[in-house]
């Protein structure tokens, strides 16, 4: 099994490729296969953004592995004007939908409920097969640089209690 534990910088050549869906690219622990069929174990640092199309990984044996975004069934959304597109993005954001933003269009994973909502908002929606590269959250994935429970990032669990019990 090819073991991969770290990301690395892009290079002009590589030894193997992984073609992964967004869900697979979002995992830090994953068993998968190269495009040539070799068994791979991913053990990446937790709390990092998903792997993106064109990212590079360094295997334990020194091989370079390039990541490709696997084409997925997506909804491609366009609108008559910027206001309508912004309104569609607003409603999708309220539902915490992963969203790829292009020049005059939005893409999201295929979902018939969201497709119906978008059509009701007046959007033009078509189904496409394409790699999915959604925006990352503006506030990151909660990653920090403390180690071993350092006080700066060591927060005690908190139970939220709504109302008073007697």
From Swiss-Prot:
Function as written in the Swiss-Prot or TrEMBL entry: Involved in urease metallocenter assembly. Binds nickel. Probably functions as a nickel donor during metallocenter assembly.
CDD domains cross-referenced by the UniProt entry: UreE
Protein's recorded name: Urease accessory protein UreE
Residues spanning the signal sequence: none
Domain of life of the source: Bacteria
Keyword DNA-binding: no
Entries under InterPro entries matching the protein: UreE (IPR012406), UreE_C_dom (IPR007864), UreE_N (IPR004029), UreE_N_sf (IPR036118)
Gene Ontology biological process terms from the UniProt entry: protein folding; protein-containing complex assembly; urea metabolic process
């Amino acid at each position: 099994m090819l073991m991969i534990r770290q990301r690395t910088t892009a290079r002009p050549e590589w030894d193997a490729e992984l073609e992964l869906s967004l869900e697979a690219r979002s995992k830090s622990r994953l068993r998968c296969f190269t495009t040539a069929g070799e068994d791979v174990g991913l053990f990446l640092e937790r709390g990092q953004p998903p792997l993106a199309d064109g990212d590079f990984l360094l295997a334990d044996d020194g091989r370079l592995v390039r990541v490709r975004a696997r084409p997925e069934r997506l909804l491609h959304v366009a609108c008559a004007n910027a206001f309508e597109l912004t309104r569609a993005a607003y409603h999708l954001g309220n539902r915490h939908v992963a969203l790829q933003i292009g020049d005059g269009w939005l893409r999201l994973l295929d979902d018939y409920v969201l497709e119906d909502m978008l059509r009701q908002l007046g959007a033009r929606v078509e189904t496409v097969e394409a790699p999915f590269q959604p925006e990352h959250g503006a506030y990151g994935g909660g990653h920090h640089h403390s180690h071993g429970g350092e006080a700066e990032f060591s927060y005690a669990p908190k139970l939220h209690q709504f109302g008073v019990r007697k």
